[in-house]
A protein has these predicted regions:
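Ligand-binding pockets and gating/stacking loops
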Residues: 1-175
């Protein structure tokens, strides 16, 4: 847990430097262990969040502050998400299990006004209360931030399935 969590800040610093140097797209994958089932292979919630939650918060906050200070807030789009959420209730081992009903998503920059909460869950966090955002909406958001979708439709040589999928994906509605 600890060694994996210590690398994110360095990776985000490298990503910012690559963007400043003109790189148009940087992908970071972490080896963070968000599985906090509280079983023989995984930490429980309290230990797990101490091991990865705090370092994640620190690294991402420092990255955002660094980008803002350098005037890169509109030029860099940070997206942080996982493939699933966690159960609304803590299990008998003090952990949480996989949950497909809701997934956290953090978006920063790219001209999107910060401080927004988009969507709402039920009080117990088990399912969406408002219209859910899905992977297609996320892809639509990324493509709308990166490309002029109208121009993309008329480009020669692009796979028609990709263009059709991207142009039909509704971006997440931010204020």
């Amino acid at each position: 847990y600890q060694n994996n969590a210590q690398t994110l800040g360095k990776l985000l610093l490298l990503a910012r430097r690559l963007c400043e140097a003109g790189c148009g797209f940087v992908t970071i994958t972490t080896r963070f262990v968000w599985d906090m089932h509280g079983d023989q292979n995984n930490l429980g919630m309290q230990q797990g969040m101490a091991a990865v939650g705090r370092p994640f918060d620190h690294a991402v906050s420092a990255f955002i502050e660094d980008c803002q200070a350098r005037g890169l807030g509109d030029d860099i789009l940070l997206v942080s998400t996982g493939e699933m959420g966690r159960t609304p209730r803590i299990n008998k081992n003090g952990g949480r299990d996989h949950w497909g009903g809701l997934t956290p998503l953090l978006v920063y920059g790219g001209g999107i006004r910060g401080g927004q909460v988009v969507g709402q869950s039920t009080r117990d966090g088990s399912k969406p209360l408002t219209a859910p955002c899905n992977s297609r909406n996320l892809l639509g958001t990324l493509m709308a931030q990166l490309f002029d979708i109208g121009e993309l439709r008329i480009k020669q040589g692009l796979p028609t399935d990709l263009v059709r999928y991207v142009s039909s994906a509704t971006p997440i509605q931010f204020d």
